[in-house]
Amino acid sequence: MSEADGPDGPGAMTEVFDAVYRGESPFGKRPPWEIGEPQPVYVALEEAGLIGGAVLDAGCGTGEDALHLAGKGYAVTGLDLSPTAVSLARDKAAERGLDAVFDVADALELTGYEGRFDTVIDVGLAHTFDAGRLRAYAAALHRACRPGALAHILSISDRGAAEMQARLAEAIAEIPAPLPDDASESPGLRRSADHLRDGFADGWTVESITGTRIRGVVPPTAELLDVHAWLGRFRRI
């Protein structure tokens, strides 16, 4: 079986996330990363002048961050592995009268997007990758970006993941309270600043990695929850 067809390949992950976006998971109709508004971090980055040129929203989900930037006049492309998420994002764009492109793509390849982007935003995609896949992702972004492009990577931390898991477990019976033991189940999966730094070591310079908050939602209650995260800013060489 090839990696692409294996349990961690894009085909398997498409099925997993499509089911989530169809409402066929313990989260119900709303997964915890679909907060119904842009992430406050990216609102602040845009206001600070740190978004520019052609923008890629990598792992865009249903498009809230991409649509926020499109509403500000940016040329935005949102890419996601899930056709269901992309369809929902396109519907939102049409309903709001916003001009944004949404397509299905594998973030570890980004074939056909070479040299297209000046800014990347990522809400919670990088933190799903182990060390090897994170390096492949950074390499794909390098190919898709122009020299000097900035990648803003918002990635939940170990502490934030534990906070979110505990709150979800209180609200949803099917979700266990403790996080899985990553050391045994996925040895390369970490949620540290060093994990991000190492992943973007080739072809990128690290401008900053700072502690911040990522916003999630507790699906049954619609409670918004801000938990600890890392914000990495990387510049393409």
Predicted regions: what they are:
Residues 118:
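Conserved acidic residues
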Residues 124-128:
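Short catalytic micro-motifs in class I SAM-dependent methyltransferases
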